[in-house]
Structures are given as C-alpha cells and as structure tokens.
Design a protein with these regions (language model features):
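Alpha-helix N-cap/start motif
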Residues: 106-107, 175
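Pore- or pathway-lining transmembrane helices of multi-pass membrane proteins that form conduits
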Residues: 20-28, 175-190
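Hydrophobic/aromatic residues in alpha-helical transmembrane segments
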Residues: 79-83, 131, 163-164, 188
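Terminal transmembrane helical anchor/hairpin motif
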Residues: 39-62, 181-213
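Hydrophobic alpha-helical transmembrane segments
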Residues: 1-78, 82-85
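Secretory targeting signals
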Residues: 34-37, 54-73, 112-175
Length: 213
C-alpha cells in the first residue's frame, strides 16, 4: 500500500505542476457556478411571476437542467486531459522500463496512478460541495441525503471515466492520441443511449451500455 500511495503522490505532484490541472478546476468551478446561479435566477423569476414552484432541491440539483445533470453531461470532457499522460508519458520517455525493472508490481503502478485521478476527482466533488453548502443556507428544507447521493454518483462516474482513460493511456505512447481516443470512447458511451430508441431490443441494450444512465 505504501508504494501505491507514493506513486499516487508523485503523479499528483506531476499533475499539479502543470497548469492543466489548475485550469480544469477553475473552469469546472465557473461552469458549476454559472449553472447554479442560472437555476436560482429562473426560480426567482418564476416566484415573482407567481408561477407554481417545484421542490427546489430537485430542481436545483437533479432537474433536466439541474447542476448535477449539467456536470454529468460535460464531465467526460475533463477526464481525458487528466489521464492522457498517466502511462503514455512513461512509455514515450522510456521511464516505463525503469518502473518495470524496479521492485514494484505492475498492479501497484496501475493502482497508484488510478488513485491519483480518484483523488483529483474527489477535489472536483469538493468544488460542487461548496455550492451544496451555499444551497443549504439558502433553502429551508434542503434534501441533504438526496444531494449527497447525487455527489456520490458523480464521483463514481468520474472514477469510471478515469479507469477508461488509464486503460486508453496504456495503449499508446502519444498523449494526444490517448486523450482523443479516451474522449471518443467516453463520448460514445454517453451518447449511445440515444441510438435505436424506436426498437425495444436496441433501446434495452443501449440503455445498459450507456455509462451516463
């Protein structure tokens, strides 16, 4: 376990030494903030027009235009940029030979690099949690359990994306190729649920294959 944590820490250091990791956190936070404020503004407008209001917790976080749905629809765009160099960088630089010849198991290398992206994914969830805290002080009866379940679901989805990205990174020595191939696979798994909806058999198959639900 110590070797896994050391590899994860080293990978996180490499990740945060580059501007990509910080830039993605900022973009992710701004995107979530814009979605959050737009929903609140729409609800305030509906209240002023005396329109019937729905349960604010679900509208704010889980509606068709909710915060969690917006994050789910765009999360696959972030992960390829994070995972593209996990193993392809080692292969292109030749350091993979040193890793394989060192007293470290291949499974420890894989788990260590995967753990680094899991930790980064948790950081993105922490950013979303800030908006949940803001909603907690703005909404009288926020459905906390419902919101926590949504955060957990997004975290697990990010971990699944990370596993796919790590696998694609192991197939090539070019980071750009790894990023593009990961993006293609994740996009396919996200949009495959829209294929063949007029046919029961195809609809059932694409529903189960679709990673975004």
């Amino acid at each position: 376990m110590k070797k896994i944590f050391k590899i994860a820490r080293l990978e996180l250091n490499i990740l945060f030494y580059s501007p990509i990791a910080w830039l993605l956190v900022i973009i992710f936070g701004v995107q979530a903030g814009l979605t959050f404020t737009e929903i609140l503004y729409a609800q305030e407008t509906s209240q002023q027009l005396e329109r019937p209001l729905q349960v604010l917790s679900k509208v704010l976080f889980a509606g068709d235009n909710g915060l969690f749905k917006a994050v789910q629809d765009t999360l696959y765009l972030y992960i390829p940029l994070l995972t593209m160099g996990l193993l392809s960088r080692e292969t292109s630089s030749g350091s993979i030979k040193l890793l394989l010849s060192s007293p470290v198991k291949i499974s420890e290398i894989v788990f260590g690099k995967f753990l680094s992206i899991v930790i980064y994914s948790f950081l993105l969830i922490v950013v979303l949690t800030l908006y949940v805290v803001a909603a907690h002080f703005s909404i009288e009866a926020l459905d906390v359990q419902f919101v926590i379940g949504g955060l957990l679901g997004l975290f697990l989805l990010a971990c699944a994306y990370a596993a796919i990205g790590l696998f694609m990174s192991s197939l090539t020595s070019y980071q750009v190729v790894a990023a593009i191939s990961t993006l293609a696979v994740l996009a396919g798994l996200n949009f495959i649920g829209q294929i063949g909806q007029d046919y029961d058999l195809v609809r059932d198959i694409t529903y189960w294959v679709s990673i975004s639900g």
